[in-house]
């Protein structure tokens, strides 16, 4: 059995020595297949389903992220919004207006559950990489309304520090909106 080199609820390891140390200490690996290529960005395997002959991503990661979802623009100016994601099964999304006047929504790879410092660091690295890759600086932040989520705490702090609009979204509303966005994209 091959695994991505991380413990459950931990981010994918980017260093062979650390991966071996963590997997061996947990007693779940007999060997490690490594490589001398640097891992610049943590991408897990994508999970898809085929429905009526069409591939439907369940978890966007390798091969699907950060491909944009094309959404209708709400008005003449679609600001760059950074959606910070939930605590569990987290991703990040950035929007911008594309050349056709639609909103392009760039969704990050699956990051995992943001419950510890290592996973929050992976979340932060994914956010920085997404902003850098598309040369985008958020004009507004969106986060879950839950007061204890690390991503929401970060968004609230950044909104205060940089005087950015903050859009707090109820968790179940975000689920519905994401399903609708994927359905029309």
Residues of each region from the PLM?
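Acidic, glycine-enriched active-site microenvironments
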Residues: 1-185
